[in-house]
Amino acid sequence: MQNNVLILDFGSQYTQLIARRVRELNIYCEIYPYHKIPEDLSGFKAVILSGSPFSVRAEDAPHPDLSQIRGKLPILAVCYGAQYFAHFHGGKVEPSDTREYGRANLTVIKDAEPLFENIKENSQVWMSHSDSIIRLPENGVRLASTSDVLNAAYRIEGEQTFAIQFHPEVYHSTDGKQLLENFLIKIAGTKATWTPGKFVDLTVSELKEKVGDDKVVLGLSGGVDSTVAAVLLHKAIGKNLYCIFVNNGLLRKNEFESVLDQYKDMGLNVKGVDASARFLDALKGLSDPEEKRKAIGNTFIEVFDDEAHEIKDVVYLAQGTIYPDVIESVSVNGPSVTIKSHHNVGGLPDFMKLKIVEPLRMLFKDEVRRVGKELGIDKELLGRHPFPGPGLAIRILGDITEEKVRILQEVDHIFIQGLRDWMLYDKVWQAGAILLPIQSVGVMGDERTYEQVVALRAVESTDGMTADWVNLPYEFLQKTSNTIINRVKGVNRVVYDISSKPPATIEWE
């Protein structure tokens, strides 16, 4: 059915955000690099051109051939896209006298224009550009302006091509979602039929057809992605799904046992493997973050390969790959090195030569959670904070020892349980504790101490690309600090990380 939206990516940092806003309207969309336009466009109802870090005036500026699209499908050209049509089709683009970054207010000039229906007067929009459209392209009609940008929006007569200089996908554009809805539903005629329920039905049907009676092996992590992937596959192929949950000794306190029990209660065919001693041995003497990651990854492959060999006649390896991973692997900036490139590569473990099945590969993180809810997965599992693949190894700065893991598990448990008790857990996107490679002087009773320092970290975010530190109540921080110092032997100082991303990252390593 022709109801999909094609998003052409020109390298903008906001391209994935466009796709998420479209999906929020229950409309399916896919992202393609601007130079890899699908040959078959029969399934698409509309096209959106993204912004770009390039200037259309630059010699190496993206210049795609849109002849198979223009005049045949409705087009919404965002930022660079708007300048592209002007620059290459009879208009003029020059450096702005006043660079416009941030908030601006929109004045709609053209009355009764469907693109701006139900959008408030002086609506706030988000600008991010240093070039301006001085002259509109051939047959261009101005639709809106701001105080600094004369041609903030226009359309091209004789075709359903609309261009806007601002970013409707960014939250700061207060009516951006309405504008996208106007374009996609009222102008392009797409239908809002992309729902979690429909995705589940379609995916289960496709998995049954693709996998049939073959066996599938899946490594579970306890995270949202692998859990939802497992339940979807189980719904499609039942006991032919073999799940392996590896304890690397770097999980949170009691996590291995509690999550394994939850998986079994869900009816999954899962085997728990305690390989904690093997991982700690592989990490012995390592302090460099990348060396630690590599050691954990290699050990996991060895453990998983050993366990996968116990299952006879496995054909497929399932992965919890989600859409941002897929987009990155075919991005404008070139493919990243990912596990997906491992097919039939000599020298790799046998399980990595299996056929790949990725039931979530077209979903964003928030959609994975909605699908999980549709599948009836416990909200506690779905609402869990993101947790790094290497586990506590990258929250213990420096070398790893069993004693350091014990200390951090206790500290982390007190912090996370405190967030739950204070009804703060669901207001935080990610939280955790970090064991620092320093000791500090303290006083306990009449004795001088020289013990470990731990940092607490809590951030709010939408997707982890950017993050702000959470202003937790002082009373909560005070109580948590006191509890940690009194209960965890070996810790005498607690600090709270108030760094945002950027410039800092969420994890310390």
From Swiss-Prot:
Class of enzymatic activity (EC top level): ligase
Provide the binding site for ATP: 221-227
**What's the domain of life for this entry?**
Bacteria
**CDD domains documented for this protein:** GATase1_GMP_Synthase, GMP_synthase_C
ATP-binding as a keyword? Answer: yes
Domain named GMPS ATP-PPase: residues = 194-384
Q: By its UniProt entry, which Gene3D superfamilies does this protein fall under? A: 3.30.300.10, 3.40.50.880, HUPs (3.40.50.620)
Role summary: Catalyzes the synthesis of GMP from XMP.
The subunit structure is: Homodimer.
From the Swiss-Prot or TrEMBL record, give the protein name: GMP synthase [glutamine-hydrolyzing]
Species this protein is from: Christiangramia forsetii (strain DSM 17595 / CGMCC 1.15422 / KT0803) (Gramella forsetii)
What is the taxonomic lineage of the source species? Bacteria, Pseudomonadati, Bacteroidota, Flavobacteriia, Flavobacteriales
